Regions:
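Juxtamembrane/transmembrane-helix boundary motifs at the membrane-water interface
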Residues: 31-49, 304-313
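A structural signal for alpha-helix termini and helix-coil/disorder junctions
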Residues: 37, 288-291, 367
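Membrane-proximal cytoplasmic C-terminal regulatory module of class A 7TM GPCRs
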Residues: 393-399
Length: 399
């Protein structure tokens, strides 16, 4: 018996085993989400089974390898309970999976998470693209009013395909942040053009251009000899004082625009048309359902998975309005607070703040903010490893 106890103590004393538990659960959740976003045949039983299995793996990592002060531990339980209540009332699971991964990512090297994300999401994207081009799965094609053809390339909808590419690019840029070359910027601009041409996805094309612009301008300001120190200082001060609040600022603007929308105003009508009716759809959902503390199950009727005409389209695309109405005020506040905390922990890393800003802009129109198969950035909240974990990393050469 003592031998088993000794082996157990030795096992939990090595944080590497905690990493294995986390990444096993992370890969399972990530692969499930990616597979559901493709046109490949779906197995509902396996999809449902993957959630408790992944939760068990990550839960074991948290229980056996993570240590918190009492106040922080109680706060985490409040967050988890509020999230679970939100999922119960909204009949959704994405919020729970995101919070579970946020809690489980404690002391996990963030770039490892990004690289695993890049491999899994990239591999499924390539597989779906190739399968759709040779006819193994359907390449859904939609025709706009202007006769432009939109391709989904094996994903359930063209904008979901382009969104995957945008989020992959945010990860690639961050990983390559210290060795950025002109070819990366030019290639990304070209990708934005390709996405616009084949998918007619304005949002993700513009989001990629914003990402390229932030990285290019930021690198020029930081490294170019012709830029004065005064400009460098102002740039840094802006991002470290205002940039860390980019998500709540953009969330308030998005929700405010939705609630202030008036169908009798030319300005609001034109803006609503430019945003593909996002404002009117969001406002209608608010009037019909209201805002609740822990959310509500709102039936979403949208495009995707089929090319059949949808007559009663009713989908809340704006992430911030979506979270507020579906997941409730409690989880909405938790999410914004986590993003602020995440940015504050990475405040010295401007490239991290650039990525969050680009994602925040994208989420004004798209609904992917708590879908881990798209948005992995909130897991950066665990980037600051404890002293004990740092020593383990250094001794095992994990970097």
């Amino acid at each position: 018996m003592k031998a088993w106890e000794q082996k157990y103590q030795e096992w939990i004393s090595d944080f590497y085993h905690g990493e294995l538990l986390f990444f096993a659960g992370f890969i399972l959740i990530l692969f499930r989400g990616m597979w559901l976003s493709t046109m490949f045949p779906q197995n509902r039983m396996l999809s449902l089974l993957s959630i408790p299995v992944a939760s068990l793996l990550i839960g074991l990592k948290i229980l056996l390898f993570d240590h918190y002060p009492v106040k922080q531990f109680l706060m985490l339980w409040v967050v988890l309970i509020c999230t679970m209540l939100s999922c119960y009332f909204s009949h959704t699971v994405n919020a729970f999976l995101m919070i579970l991964l946020v809690l489980g990512s404690k002391d996990i090297e963030f770039e490892k998470i990004l690289k695993v994300y890049l491999v899994i999401v990239g591999a499924v994207m390539v597989l779906a693209f190739l399968a759709s081009t040779v006819g193994v799965i359907e390449n859904l094609q939609y025709e706009r009013e202007n006769k432009r053809l939109r391709n989904a390339f094996g994903i359930i909808y063209p904008t979901d395909f382009s969104a995957h590419l945008f989020y992959l690019l945010t990860v690639i840029f961050y990983i390559k942040r210290n060795t950025m070359k002109s070819i990366y910027y030019l290639g990304s601009i070209g990708l934005a053009g390709v996405i616009y041409y084949f998918c007619d996805s304005r949002l993700d094309s513009v989001s990629i251009l914003i990402l390229v612009g932030l990285y290019w301008i930021g690198n020029e300001i930081e490294n170019a000899s012709f830029v004065s120190r005064n400009i460098q200082k102002k740039w840094n001060v802006f991002w470290k004082s205002v940039g860390i609040y980019s998500v709540p600022i953009i969330a308030v603007l998005s929700i405010g625009a939705t609630f202030l929308y008036r169908g009798t105003s030319t300005f609001w009508v034109d803006l609503n048309k430019f945003l593909s009716n996002r404002l009117s759809l969001g406002q209608n959902a608010y009037i019909k359902n209201g805002i609740r503390l822990f959310g509500k199950n709102i039936e979403m009727v949208g495009f995707g998975g089929t090319t059949e005409t949808v007559l009663d389209y009713n989908f809340i695309d704006c992430s911030y309005v979506h979270i507020l109405l579906v997941n409730g005020m409690a989880f909405f506040c938790i999410l914004l607070a986590l993003y602020v905390l995440c940015n504050k922990k990475n405040v010295k890393n401007l490239c991290f703040l650039y990525a969050i800003f680009a994602v925040a802009i994208n989420c004004m129109v798209a609904h992917h903010i708590v879908q881990i198969e798209y948005n992995v950035w909130l897991l950066g909240i665990g980037i600051n490893c404890s002293k004990v974990t740092r020593r383990i990393y250094e001794s095992n050469d994990f970097s």
